[in-house]
Amino acid sequence: DSEYHHAKGRVINMRTGIIGAGKVGCSLGKYFRLNNLKVTGYYDVNENLAKEAATFTETTFIEDLETIVKISDTLFLTVPDDLITTVWNQMKDMSLEGKFICHCSGALSAGDAFPGIDKCGAFGYSVHPLFAVSDKYNSYKELSHAYFVIEGDEKHREEIAGIFNNLGNEVRYIAAKDKVKYHCAAAVCSNHVVALIQESLDLMQECGFDEESALKALAPIMLGNMQHIAERGTVNSLTGPVERADVKTVEKHLNCLDEKQQMLYRLLSEVLISIGEKKNPGRDYGRLKHILGNE
């Protein structure tokens, strides 16, 4: 219990420095400041970006890497994925004893990003918000809804989690070996869905819609479906011809598509059948599987 209170006390008094003044760095810094966490300031190789971020978050512009490292207990390296280790290599010979070094990459583990960190007496963490940070100056408003996934040194993991628990965020730990698969899951849900919607829009345009009117027409079913999935899960949200094992309609769909579109339709329908079988254990999907080339 005393250890918990010590950890909680350390979180409250933690001084956090942000290296990299892009969308994620700006959003995190603003979010921390609004919740009365101590942000030492911003450092970026592009001084103008760091100055803008410091002004926006009402913190301090810091001129050099050594200073921000020296005055911070925790450092967030919010730079592009391929630069994280580059920045780390510039820091690792500084005095890092007892400091927490964090990055926000979804795919990189702390060990991959910060090679040799254990020899420096510092502790490495990947802290990934499951959230699309798309707007440098507005995304912070939505960060309270984000789910943070943390991976790294178990010794002080609770303190890193405590930062976000104290802000009301949900937090989950993940093993380093699962980082890439976890990131792939997030990408499918966030990015690949966009590709499917584009496919749908393209088909609508072949029927005479322009993209704007197609999007307006499809928005209610897209948004409604996402809401249902979020609230009730995929099994309870699935409807449509594949779920009903409506062979005739599926055949017609396949006939109106080109070869590439058919391939996508077939692959996705396989997944829909597996969901349909959970929803309707007594329904026979045999003929449908045959038509889709599954059997």
Predicted regions and their residues:
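Short coil/turn segments
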Residues: 21, 106-107, 130, 152-155
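Short, well-ordered alpha-helices that flank and scaffold nucleotide-derived cofactor binding pockets
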Residues: 26, 30-34, 55, 89-93, ...
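Internal alpha-helical scaffold of NAD(P)-dependent oxidoreductase catalytic cores
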Residues: 49-56, 121, 138-230, 292
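Rossmann-like NAD(P)(H) cofactor-binding subdomain of soluble oxidoreductases
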Residues: 60-138
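Interdomain hinge/lid region at the active-site interface
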Residues: 227-283, 295
